[in-house]
Amino acid sequence: LACVLVESWNLLLALRALLGLALSGLPALAMAYVGEEFDPPSLPAAMGLYIGGTALGGLLGRLLSGLLSDIGGWELALGGIAGLGLLALGLFVWLLPASRHFKAQPLSLRVLLGNFRLHLRNPRLRGLFLQAFLLMGGFVALFNYIGFRLAGAPFGLSSTVIGLLFVVYLAGIFSAGWAGRLVPRFGARNVLRGGVGLMLLGVALCASAWLAAIVLGLGLFTLGFFAAHAVASGQVGIHAEGAKAQASALYLCAYYLGSSVVGYVAGYVWEHAGWLPLMAVLAALFVIAAWRARSL
């Protein structure tokens, strides 16, 4: 809310940076809570519902901020989103059950580093961190540059129409929960590979010059991403040997590192080689992800 009131550009940037720092810890804490409070058989479905909720939030945030910006400018958009955040905080405090399995530990740099080393020595966790890097990197890369592709020839779509493509996030809301329920029946490895397979099919369709095929490809790609992400993030809580919050934090570090590194590389490929080579790079990433899923 303070961002709406300040008049200094530098102060606004500082407040947004603080907001980013605060937000970055929330997914790790949420994943750790789910991992600690649900038993292993029900954990994949619970994590799938959580990931589906993040997809819904991402969609509503984009649509609502755009609507409020058109009505009253960026101040109304920021204020409206902040107001909804306060409402969500109140509901969170009121409805969230107290943790039953959390064990407090003294804050110690030596203990923190020891826990990080423990997680990084775990081959299954390393495999999951790699999945986070590859999957999120590819997801961000496609959605970062598909707009440039569709704005240019032969499509020439407007920014408004391109923005509506984020409606495909609805597919992720359902696929995340669906994937979590499939894990007990088919196993995490197979469900994860199925999600990555959908991403590969989506990339192949996005390489087309036919708009309908690209829209279908984006839908399948989003289905696959949220399914695979739900499975991988749920497995972190299962395979972490204690200190689940730090294991989740490492997963998310890999997740966002992938978005930064692959997003940058994808931009270079797009600028210097074009769309089809970019699709080939993304396909290669997902082939690696499917191959490395054998470690689960």
Describe the role of every protein-language-model region.
Residues 121-138, 219-220:
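Pair of pore-lining "gating" transmembrane helices in MFS-fold secondary transporters
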Residues 4-11, 39, 208-209:
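Helix-breaking motifs and short loop linkers at transmembrane-helix boundaries and internal kinks
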Residues 15-53:
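Cytoplasmic helix-loop-helix junction between adjacent transmembrane helices
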Residues 49-96:
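Helix-loop-helix hairpin linking two adjacent transmembrane segments in secondary transporters
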